[in-house]
Curated annotation (Swiss-Prot):
Transmembrane segments: none annotated. Residues 251-257, 275-279 are annotated as: RNA binding. It comes from Streptococcus pneumoniae (strain P1031). It is an enzyme of class 2 (transferase). It catalyses: 7-aminomethyl-7-carbaguanine + guanosine(34) in tRNA = 7-aminomethyl-7-carbaguanosine(34) in tRNA + guanine. Keywords: Glycosyltransferase, Metal-binding, Queuosine biosynthesis, Transferase, tRNA processing, Zinc. Its cofactor is Zn(2+). One of its GO terms (cellular component) is cytosol. Its EC number is 2.4.2.29. The gene is tgt. Pfam families: TGT. InterPro entries: ArchSynthase1/Queuine_TRR, TGT, TGT-like_sf, tRNA_ribo_trans-like. This is Queuine tRNA-ribosyltransferase. The lineage of its organism: Bacteria, Bacillati, Bacillota, Bacilli, Lactobacillales.
Amino acid sequence: MSDSPIKYRLIKKEKHTGARLGEIITPHGTFPTPMFMPVGTQATVKTQSPEELKEMGSGIILSNTYHLWLRPGDELIARAGGLHKFMNWDQPILTDSGGFQVYSLADSRNITEEGVTFKNHLNGSKMLLSPEKAISIQNNLGSDIMMSFDECPQFYQPYDYVKKSIERTSRWAERGLKAHRRPHDQGLFGIVQGAGFEDLRRQSAHDLVSMDFSGYSIGGLAVGETHEEMNAVLDFTTQLLPENKPRYLMGVGAPDSLIDGVIRGVDMFDCVLPTRIARNGTCMTSQGRLVVKNAQFAEDFTPLDPECDCYTCNNYTRAYLRHLLKADETFGIRLTSYHNLYFLLNLMKQVRQAIMDDNLLEFRKYFVEKYGYNKSGRNF
């Protein structure tokens, strides 16, 4: 895919780490990296408008192939003019392959060489998602960046199982490349798997790099392993990927994990975390994790995060946010979701500046101490 519509441009490498500052050029515009991508599962980032996403600095969003295939259907979206037009988003979109949802949501799934048969979680009907079908759906959606179909083995599965799994994922990747109908306006990424086994990650990366994808995703992390185990896998995996292609760590959104991924050379991240925890009133702030629903904030008339200049923090108090959430008002979820997304996008902006200034390790130390990780024992 040497004439790929997705191009990575390296701007600067950080002197003391593997971090890199760059930009990714797509058919729907260019965005800076490292970048966090908000997740729009059902062709919407929950409770946020496209205008709000642009306002907070989101250069690209992610949407889910599995969910859009089942409802409203990829062919309907194609008739609407593609996903960009359907959801009124004129900037880059990345779609996943649907594989992770099949493994995590669907019932009675069965993995064969052909693909994965499963029960539709909406109506119980039996369906098959194959490498070719995953590509066909994404071709209909018209995303800028597509994912090849993979199996995501659990981190602690036995070596022999993971070995068979990555070999099948490589065969599926090759089939997906052959099925790709729109290589000139949609980039396709391969997904490196291998659980925690260095030799299997190496084999997976070698297979996929030889196929010359537009970029490479690192899958099978943030699925229950420790933070240290994830960092150890990233330490060797990013080294196996080409310098002239984007690197994407899937499903990671905790602030310290984002910084640690960047330190190891990752360019792109996505996660439902900021919006999911916002719906329960959990907010990421410059002083750490804050559950604004808690009784201690009932008469707290200060901003959610005094150091944040997002719409929520500029206009509303902790007491008001608590009231909205306790009263089950959607506006409360909109405001906490906006803040959490803004917080992570702004964190990545600070990370990009730290790479420019060659002080990313100092920034990490300052951020982690201030966020209070060691006090709470939690990573968000």
